[in-house]
Each structure stands twice: as C-alpha cells, then as structure tokens.
Amino acid sequence: MEGVTVVSFFLLFIATAMAAKSTVSFRDGMLPNGDFELGPKPSDMKGTEILNKLAIPNWEVTGFVEYIKSGHKQGDMLLVVPAGKFAVRLGNEASIKQRLKVVKGMYYSLTFSAARTCAQDERLNISVAPDSGVIPIQTVYSSSGWDLYAWAFQAESDVAEVVIHNPGVEEDPACGPLIDGVAMRSLYPPRPTNKNILKNGGFEEGPLVLPGSTTGVLIPPFIEDDHSPLPGWMVESLKAVKYVDVEHFSVPQGRRAIELVAGKESAIAQVVRTVIGKTYVLSFAVGDANNACKGSMVVEAFAGKDTLKVPYESKGTGGFKRASIRFVAVSTRSRIMFYSTFYAMRSDDFSSLCGPVIDDVKLISVRKP
C-alpha cells in the first residue's frame, strides 16, 4: 500500500511538473518562441507540413500547419518572412496555441504579423476564452505583403490560452495565412481627468510595437469585441487604423499617434459623457508620419452634431498643425469621431496605404463666451 502511495505521489509530481512546463509566465514582449525560429525536428515534418502537434517548441498546433522558411516558393510566388528566417502557415481550420500565466482581470493586447498567400477573402479568428474576434486580412496595407495586427482581451483566470485559428475553407487546403512575430503586452486603460474628458487622448496606451518594426500596428474594426487594443477608442469603420510610434514615424505629441490609412473607411471614435446645453472644445493635432505620404489631406472631426474639416498639405517628411471645434452638447453622451476624407498611397512605393496622423486629442468643458 505504501508503494502504491509513493508511485501515486511520483505520478502526481510528474503531471504537475509537465503542466507547469507547458504554461509560461508572461512578460511584455515576444511570446516564448513567438518568432518561430525554434522549429520542428526533421522527423516531425513531411515536406513543410508539421506532423507532431507539439513539434514547435512552446506551441501546440492543430490541423494542417506548415513550417515555412523565408524564400520558400508557392508556385510562382516567393514567400518572404518579415523577421528572422521562419514563420508558420495555417491551412483550413488549422490553429496554433500557447498557454501563458497572466493576471486575472488584467487587460492584454496581442500583436502579430500576418500575410495572406492566396487571393481568397482570408481572415483569422483570435481567441482567449471567453473573448474572441475575427480579423480580416484581405486588405494588404503595406508593400511587403506583411502587416502587424493587434487584438485585446481581459484575462478571466490566471492562465490564458492564446489561439490563432484560420476558419477558412479554401479549395487548396494549404492555402492560408502566414503568421509570425507573436507578442503581447499588458494594458492599463487610462481614465478621464480634469484636463481631458477623453480617455487616452494622446494614444500613449496601446498595443506593443515590435522593436525593429517599421510598418506600425493595425488596429482592425472591433465592432463586436468587448475590448480594444487602443483603450478608450473604438474603430468604427470597414478598415483598420494604424498605431504608429516615435521610434519609426513622426509623431506630433508624446510617443504614439494614430494614422488614418483608408480614407472614410478608416475611423476611430469615443463616446463621452456630456451635460446637455454645456459648451465643449475639442482640440487635436493633424500631421503626417514622415513616411512619404504626400499630398492634400483632409481630416474630418465630429463632435456631437458638429463637424470640422481640417485640410493639411503633406510633404511626407513630418509636421503637423493644430485645430479645434467648439460645440454645445445636445445629449448626455456625445460621440467624438475622426476619419480621413481621401485615400492616399506612399510616394516611395505607390502600394502602401497611408494617410494623415491625429494626436493629442483633448476635450474640455468651457464657459460660454
């Protein structure tokens, strides 16, 4: 009987150790092997297909998942990896997942690179139970074919299982999106202050921008999602907005800003509490990101029922101007929204979508003149 007890204890110890090993404590930055540079053994692969679900260190794969080396050819198309030498491709109904130790109740933003490899309307399902969201990746915003995306969730327990899933059903089962550079950071949603009724008006709180990334991070439409990777703000449009940083772009104020990259299809909004009959002033900066986005631009700002069009002549080398709009609240809740009137393309490659930058957005109540 004593021997059985010892064996049972030993098996329990082994199971606990294995469980602990499969769940990694999270720190802001790249997930363990989030760049997929540690790959499967040759015995765990058939061509590019991964045969063993635990073949990629720190990850578990399900379905038809391929391990792709930069320079791999798909027919006449050359597959290029954005950083490092390797990425994974998710076939029909395939997924990758990783378990992380997190703080229950904390908000997190996931950042990852994705590229479509087929002409079909590709999308990704990102989930950390019970939160999930579908991210369309059909629109290619950069000339490289790779775009960085962000998605946010609130941890419901002290363990988060991050799942990236391809829900597509294509004619070619190997025809699916490439994934690379999976990273995450904690979010600390700011609150309104006596100097700004808006939350996160300077866009300083947002998704992780990977070091060395020069494209910015796309924040897709999150109409159905509970949490935004840009705390305080909603993306109320068909296309994404771009989160840019001072390390790689020109930013009017602080270290972060938003680039409106898809004309009227690229809009951000925030609903704030207001007092009916009270006067408010919305002020903000409009500029360009120093990314060769040249030409005549117009940002349209909406405050309650009032509208302001702000023209900006961009040389594509950085710069900004300030604007403001005064309005009287007609409701206890007022919507603040921005979008770009026109589409624009970078003048250095004529294939990357770009647009005006907005930053330093402030809303204050004022006395009537």
Curated annotation (Swiss-Prot):
Tissue occurrence: Expressed in roots, seedlings and leaves.
Gene3D superfamilies attached to this UniProt entry: Galactose-binding domain-like
Keywords: Cell wall, Glycoprotein, Secreted, Signal
Disruption phenotype: Reduced roots and rosettes development.
Pfam short name (any one): DUF642
Signal peptide: 1-19
Compartments, record wording: Secreted, Cell wall
Chief localisation class: secreted
Keyword Secreted: yes
One BP annotation, GO: root morphogenesis
Glycosylation site positions: N125
Domain of life from the UniProt record: Eukaryota
Induction (record text): Induced by L-galactono-1,4-lactone (L-GalL), the terminal precursor for ascorbic acid (AsA) biosynthesis in the Smirnoff-Wheeler pathway. Accumulates during seed imbibition.
One annotated Gene Ontology cellular component of this protein: plasmodesma
Keyword Glycoprotein carried by entry: yes
Main function: Involved in the regulation of testa rupture during seed germination. Required during roots and rosettes development.
Official protein name in the record: Protein DUF642 L-GALACTONO-1,4-LACTONE-RESPONSIVE GENE 2
Taxonomic path: Eukaryota, Viridiplantae, Streptophyta, Embryophyta, Tracheophyta
Gene this chain is encoded by: DGR2
